[in-house]
């Protein structure tokens, strides 16, 4: 059957709307050859122009539109459509002002409300966003949604809702932004892989700004592949630019390469504005190398960096395009590079606008800190920047979000810590160690109301985890989708309130007033200058240098495998070999990290705070801490607020499947609590709901179950119960959490370190939710050791001994040296 030109045009539009651009191109080419009516020829030309623009041929696209506008006999509606198409072409070429002009002409010429007019409102809103005119952008989106609803087009209305989320992102409301985008994705995702990729690119920006760069970059790389396969060069290049911006924070060398690829692609597309943006990111990436990050890694320095003339010219070009935020970030990055390399010429800092993006404001504070004449001035500048970051992040109650937002403060933390170390003053170093630890602890979560939808999604995730390979289950498309929905739901539902007692930092003298003669605080501080420890007692404080840090750092990567092997291989000829290897490694770590420190204090009780670079160290197994009582706090300030004596009257126990001596372990432990008739759940009774219900009724919760730490998404770490895995996300659903939690499980004492100080995992999730103390191990623990040691520990807990004292006493009585350690306010 031979299709008419009108039918081919209709089919071409259907293909375009579904993202099938190759099929659309063929249908429209045939339609153009058969069209006689000038109005139809013009409409076909307009749609072909859209495809040409997507194919990277903006000149051809513009010519198609202007030639069509010159035809006699075209309708007002077609004229409006062509003006709208010219606006979209201008938008893709990086000319938002021209786009607004053409789109306004198209909107004014459109005779009545329709889907086409709504699409022009949608595109004009994007142009307003690029110009920073967010109120105008929001107004256009509201008009677009009204037109789409009148036209009964929910799919297009979802696109508008998604863009409302992008406006919230630009306004700094990450939670609201992700909420709109996830809601829109439910409708958009079914359209095509192109629609899904378009939405994913914007969601990746939200995740990047939230510090979740791994997830953001995974989405962007997938989108780049989709756009490349569909020959959508503009969208592909924009996604590469976004990927480079994300990599800039942690992999500047790769960021420079990706930005260069985007720059080349934009040059081919003749998009001057977009090319300048990519060139700016590439220049910043080249200037960002050669620093020590918060994990102790030295980022490689670029062989060649842009000189002052290149930076000045590029910044001026960005200014000319109205991208003053990009220009300012580039200028500040260049000044910072010059200061760090001893080439500062005293160029005054550019004047910031009140509306400057947070990234630019924080960069300015970092430059002021680097240029400061004295360490005191440097600390003051860095502190002001961190206070501004804290004000922005204050409303976020989610642990997932709080810990990741610390990304934005990394440079300022490094500057402040380095300045504090330069003084050699224990009080200054302690203050900045607390600033680093408290950056993600300024607020605590309000307990959310019951959420059946979140519960349903977590239940489906439990089923998927049971069915899929343990090491890759979150890569499954459905699991990944559910994980994103759970994250959005949890971000939105967990509000924040001030931390107890206002969340104030305790200073060194304030901490010392809380220490008795037999208690000391060890605050390990990592900075670009290395590792040091502030040792504080009731009447004295000093800074201890740890010159062996570099050697200790090389011992950490093999530590976990030694610990896991030692717990798994308990007999046979290899057991002694493995044990000797582990003992040697632990002795070396103790000598390098603790011997210089413990030589300064005879205190039996030690409050220990550590940076993320020391995550995973089994402190309780290090020889220099034998015979001492230790508690490992998120921060000394939080310990100070929660150190009041515990009153533990009731206990509950749960055993997961396939734990060899699990029932024996909890039965032995529960015998210490017989006067209160402790609840014990095992077998089919040890369910998610059963344990969750028990949690609210006990002071001490002890779970003996197999556990697994999920590094890519630590809040999907969990404990295996009878009907699935209890995730970290489940903890925020609990109306009340116990005072003390004992996790006798493989790995769940581990944490994934995000951006330096703040670790996240099951242990941190319980503490964040309100538990005073968590007893857990960062590695595999032999079932025999867990059974005997924890049973003895419960005797102390039931007798009123503090958790840290109870664990230390149990270790001494049983002679078992295991990696269990006390987190939080253990004494």
Predicted regions and their residues:
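Residue register of alpha-helical TPR repeats
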Residues: 6, 43, 81-83, 119-121, ...
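Catalytic-core domains of enzymes
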Residues: 544-547, 551-562, 581, 601, ...
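Cysteine protease catalytic core and zymogen-processing segment of caspase-like enzymes
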Residues: 623-639, 671, 708-772, 826
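Amphipathic alpha-helical protein-protein interaction segments
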Residues: 301, 308-312, 323, 343-350, ...
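Structural signature of alpha-solenoid helical repeat junctions
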Residues: 3, 40, 78, 116, ...
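An often Trp-containing, charged/polar helix-loop segment at the C-terminal end
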Residues: 786-827
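Amphipathic alpha-helical segments of tetratricopeptide repeats
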Residues: 29-33, 66-71, 104-111, 142-153, ...
């Amino acid at each position: 059957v031979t299709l008419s030109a009108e039918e081919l045009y209709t089919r071409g539009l259907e293909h375009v709307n579904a993202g099938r651009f190759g099929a659309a191109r063929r249908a429209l080419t045939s339609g153009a050859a058969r069209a006689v009516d000038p109005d139809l020829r013009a409409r076909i030309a307009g749609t072909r122009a859209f495809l040409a623009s997507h194919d990277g041929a903006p000149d051809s696209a513009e010519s198609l539109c202007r030639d069509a506008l010159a035809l006699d006999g075209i309708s007002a509606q077609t004229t409006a459509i062509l003006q709208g198409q010219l606006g979209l072409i201008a938008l893709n070429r990086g000319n938002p002002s021209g786009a607004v002009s053409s789109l306004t002409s198209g909107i004014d010429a459109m005779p009545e409300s329709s889907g086409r007019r709504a699409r022009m409102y949608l595109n004009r809103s994007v142009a307003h966003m690029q110009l920073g005119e967010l109120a105008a952008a929001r107004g256009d989106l509201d008009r677009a949604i009204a037109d789409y609803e009148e036209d009964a087009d929910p799919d297009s209305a979802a696109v508008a809702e998604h863009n409302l989320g992008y406006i919230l992102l630009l306004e700094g409301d990450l939670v609201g932004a992700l909420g709109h985008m996830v809601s829109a994705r439910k409708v958009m995702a079914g359209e095509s892989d192109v629609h899904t990729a378009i939405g994913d690119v914007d969601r990746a920006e939200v995740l990047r700004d939230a510090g979740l760069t791994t997830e953001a970059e995974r989405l962007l790389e997938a989108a780049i592949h989709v756009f490349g396969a569909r020959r959508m060069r503009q969208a592909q290049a924009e996604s590469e630019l976004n990927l480079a911006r994300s990599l800039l924070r942690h992999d500047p060398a790769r960021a420079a390469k990706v930005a260069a690829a985007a720059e080349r692609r934009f040059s081919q597309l003749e998009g001057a504005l977009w090319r300048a943006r990519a060139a700016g990111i590439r220049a910043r990436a080249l200037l960002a190398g050669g620093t020590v990050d918060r994990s102790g890694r030295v980022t490689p320095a670029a062989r060649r960096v842009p000189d002052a003339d290149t930076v000045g010219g590029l910044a001026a070009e960005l200014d000319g395009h109205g991208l003053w935020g990009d220009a300012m970030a580039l200028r500040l990055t260049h000044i910072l590079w010059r200061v760090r390399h001893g080439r500062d010429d005293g160029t005054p800092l550019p004047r910031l606008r009140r509306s400057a993006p947070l990234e630019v404001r924080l960069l300015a504070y970092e430059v002021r800190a680097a240029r400061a004449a004295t360490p005191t001035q440097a600390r003051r500048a860095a502190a002001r920047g961190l206070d501004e970051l804290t004000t922005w992040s204050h409303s976020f109650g989610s642990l997932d979000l709080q810990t990741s937002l610390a990304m934005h403060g990394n440079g300022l933390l490094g500057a402040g810590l380095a300045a504090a170390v330069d003084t050699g003053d224990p009080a200054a170093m302690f203050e900045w160690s607390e600033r680093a630890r408290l950056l993600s602890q300024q607020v605590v979560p309000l307990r959310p109301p019951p959420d059946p939808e979140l519960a349903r999604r977590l239940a489906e995730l439990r089923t998927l985890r049971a069915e899929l390979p343990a090491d890759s289950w979150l890569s499954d498309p459905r699991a990944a989708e559910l994980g994103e929905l759970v994250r959005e739901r949890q971000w939105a539902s967990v509000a924040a309130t001030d931390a107890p007692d206002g969340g104030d930092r305790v200073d060194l003298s304030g901490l010392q007033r809380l220490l008795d003669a037999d208690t000391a605080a060890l605050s390990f501080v990592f900075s670009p200058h290395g590792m040091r420890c502030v040792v504080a007692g009731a009447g004295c404080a000093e800074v201890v240098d740890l010159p062996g840090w570099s050697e200790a750092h090389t011992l950490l990567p093999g530590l976990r495998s030694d610990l896991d092997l030692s717990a798994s291989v308990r007999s046979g000829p290899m057991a002694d070999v493995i044990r000797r290897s582990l003992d040697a490694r632990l002795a070396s770590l103790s000598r390098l990290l603790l011997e210089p420190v413990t030589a300064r204090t005879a205190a039996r009780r030690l409050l220990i705070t550590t940076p993320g670079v020391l995550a995973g160290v089994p402190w309780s197994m290090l020889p220099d801490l034998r015979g001492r009582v230790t508690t490992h706090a998120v921060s000394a300030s939080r310990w100070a607020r929660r150190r009041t004596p515990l009153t533990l009257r009731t206990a509950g126990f749960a055993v997961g499947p396939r734990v060899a001596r699990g029932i024996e372990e909890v039965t032995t432990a529960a015998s210490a609590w017989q006067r209160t008739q402790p609840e014990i759940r095992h077998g089919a009774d040890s369910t998610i709901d059963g344990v969750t219900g028990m949690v609210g009724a006990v002071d001490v919760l002890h779970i003996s179950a197999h556990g697994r730490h999920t590094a890519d998404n630590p809040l999907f770490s969990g404990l295996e119960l009878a009907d699935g895995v209890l995730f970290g996300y489940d903890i925020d659903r609990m109306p009340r959490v116990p005072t003390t939690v004992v996790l006798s499980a493989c790995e769940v004492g581990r944490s994934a370190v995000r951006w330096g100080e703040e670790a996240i995992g099951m242990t941190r999730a319980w503490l964040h939710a309100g538990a005073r103390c968590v007893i857990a191990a960062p590695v595999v623990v032999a079932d025999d050791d867990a059974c005997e040691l924890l049973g003895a520990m419960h005797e102390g807990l039931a007798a009123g001994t503090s958790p840290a004292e109870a664990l230390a006493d149990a270790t001494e009585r049983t002679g078992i040296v295991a990696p269990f350690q006390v987190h939080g306010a253990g004494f």
